[in-house]
Amino acid sequence: MIKDYKVSIAIPIALLILSILLIGFKGIPKSIDITGGTEITIKVNENMDITPLKESLNGIAEVKKLESADGYYIVIRCKNEDVDIVKQKIKEFFHVDSLDKLNYSEKTIGATLSSKFFEEGFKAVGFAFMFMAIVVYLYFRNPVPSGAIILSALSDIIMALGAMSLLGIELSSATIAALLMVIGYSVDSDILLTTRVLKRLTKSFDETVKEAMKTGLTMTLTTITAMLILLIVVKLFIPVADILANIATVLILALIADIINTWLLNAGILKYYITEYRAKKI
């Protein structure tokens, strides 16, 4: 399974460093949940050309069109201070004197509330990760296997954030919730692998990892499949439910990262621990 643990560890570490560089230099786009602002959603029955609206709101607001089974949706996002200008441009585009004549909805989040949510959201992620790390250490009571699990889980989160930066997925209330879910999803296969390896020392390392991989990959791929189905359904039938789409996307990215980190990084560290570190102690 793992011929050279150094190569096995190096691949996910390289991806981890790349993710950190992406986050540091490119950043992660933030939704109005984080930055504060107004989102106006207008339902229309025909496929309209929104290029004139985009041009009139260039530099003021973000405009996009979504298609679903029951029609089309035009979504406009802007800063709270620009909302009056944006509404005026919308009225001019649709040739109406009031937005009440349109099938529209409006969501506004203040800057203070959004910054507070951002702060509390990441506190929740931090505390969840810390308590997970404590539980893992108390269970295994060994710094090397415990550290491997914690490093793998941390790498899952950072790689997911790096993928969000690369793909332009916004950091929002939904994606922060997804990151919280990632902590739970990411450690199960790591704990499965570590428990199997440490409790079956009479078997060869590669044989034990292969057995654990069958169960672990089945669990992970089942979840990825479920999230893919959710993502496809949302994109095709309810595109305005972008919260569900964002959660599904982040979980898929994180679970792909988890496959790499569990079966290369964690397994590589465990092979070093069993074949070299532990052997020297004995």
From Swiss-Prot:
GO terms for cellular component: plasma membrane. The keyword Metal-binding does not apply. It is a multi-pass membrane protein. The chain crosses the membrane at residues 9-29, 120-140, 149-169, 174-194, 214-234, 236-256. It comes from the Archaea. Part of the protein translocation apparatus. Forms a complex with SecD. This is Protein-export membrane protein SecF. It comes from Methanocaldococcus jannaschii (strain ATCC 43067 / DSM 2661 / JAL-1 / JCM 10045 / NBRC 100440) (Methanococcus jannaschii).
